[in-house]
């Protein structure tokens, strides 16, 4: 029971009343000593702390990216539609790796859009009559 830290004003859990000031002080010193020993025993090198922080920052940024909602499909207009090469009907969007997508649904949607663009040589996707 040497790892147990007792309340400062009581000798043990079963005791119903406070103890004197000297015992309280001794309990406090004992508790601080135990905390100090545990802190020294669990010392982590600076290198491990650095790697942990890098890992934590990386995982936090990944989780933030997953929280972003996908863009509104109706408001999308590809930049290729405004380029001179796009007028000839040659629309080329480089393939992306699957980890750049929010989810499988968004990947499928973009693949359908790419199919539509490759079939539609007049680029009607960017000219709306609204």
From Swiss-Prot:
Q: Which domain of life is it from?
A: Eukaryota
A cellular component annotation (GO) from this entry: cytosol
From the UniProt record, give one GO term of the biological process aspect. Answer: negative regulation of formin-nucleated actin cable assembly
Protein name, per record: Uncharacterized protein YGL015C
Organism of derivation: Saccharomyces cerevisiae (strain ATCC 204508 / S288c) (Baker's yeast)
